[in-house]
């Protein structure tokens, strides 16, 4: 299923430890039998996330490209996306039938956003472990990403976070934009994320 516009490019951002790599693993394992997929991971000085996905057998290693960004991680997904664009071009040449490319950013702050030249859809992951105040802090990634994923809901009792407060704050700052509460380590909420990608990425129409 090859789109005339090329593969759907999905940017996945979020702070360190929020669950970006776990989200990539879940999406790859959930969708790889229906779609031709690949992933680009960004780390500052290593290719750790790429190695993790390979070790988890989320997808064949030749479909994983690790990018070492150096410096500030959000520069490589917005101001100067050349390293990521080169990785995408490499994957497109190697796998001409690609339907989806995931682009996982390095750990970043709440202001980081993807260049529209790099990502067609943006998913932003935050963790309940960061505290219930995170949604109301706002920031472009929280307020304007195509889908906000509030992950690690299972940790709420241990960090004193009220999930109802987080939902209410999220609905206020996102002004109708979609969000989902997840516990990706247990795959809870994963189906909602997949359904969002298929609908908003036009995959269901193209199938």
From Swiss-Prot:
**Cited SUPFAM superfamilies:** P-loop containing nucleoside triphosphate hydrolases
What this protein is reported to do is described as: Facilitates the functional incorporation of the urease nickel metallocenter. This process requires GTP hydrolysis, probably effectuated by UreG.
Organism domain of life = Bacteria
Tell me which family the UniProt entry assigns to this protein.
Belongs to the SIMIBI class G3E GTPase family. UreG subfamily.
Q: Tell me, what is an example of a GO biological process annotation in this record?
A: urea catabolic process
The cellular component terms of Gene Ontology attached to this UniProt record, alphabetical and capped at eight, are: cytoplasm
The record, for Pfam families, names: cobW
Q: Does the keyword Zinc apply?
A: no
Query: Quaternary structure?
Result: Homodimer. UreD, UreF and UreG form a complex that acts as a GTP-hydrolysis-dependent molecular chaperone, activating the urease apoprotein by helping to assemble the nickel containing metallocenter of UreC. The UreE protein probably delivers the nickel.
Question: Where does it mainly reside?
Answer: cytoplasm
GO MF, one term, reads: nickel cation binding
Keyword list (alphabetical) reads: Chaperone, Cytoplasm, GTP-binding, Nickel insertion, Nucleotide-binding
Q: What is the name of this protein?
A: Urease accessory protein UreG
């Amino acid at each position: 299923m090859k789109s005339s516009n090329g593969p759907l490019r999905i940017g996945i951002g979020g702070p360190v430890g929020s669950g970006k790599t776990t989200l990539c693993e879940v999406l790859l394992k959930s969708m790889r039998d229906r779609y031709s997929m690949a992933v680009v991971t960004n780390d500052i000085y290593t290719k750790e996330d790429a190695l993790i996905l390979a070790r988890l057998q989320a997808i064949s290693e030749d479909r994983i490209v690790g990018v070492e960004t150096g410096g500030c991680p959000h520069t490589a997904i917005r101001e100067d996306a050349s390293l990521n664009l080169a990785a995408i071009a490499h994957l497109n040449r190697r796998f001409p039938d690609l339907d989806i490319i995931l682009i996982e950013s390095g750990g970043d702050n709440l202001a980081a956003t993807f260049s529209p030249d790099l990502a067609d859809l943006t998913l932003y992951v935050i963790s309940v472990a960061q505290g219930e105040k995170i949604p109301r802090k706002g920031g472009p990634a929280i307020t304007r990403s195509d889908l906000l994923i509030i992950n690690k809901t299972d940790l709420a009792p241990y960090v004193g976070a009220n999930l109802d407060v987080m939902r209410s704050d999220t609905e206020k700052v996102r002004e109708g934009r979609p969000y989902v509460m997840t516990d990706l380590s247990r795959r809870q909420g994963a189906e909602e994320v997949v359904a969002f990608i298929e609908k908003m990425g036009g995959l269901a129409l193209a199938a």
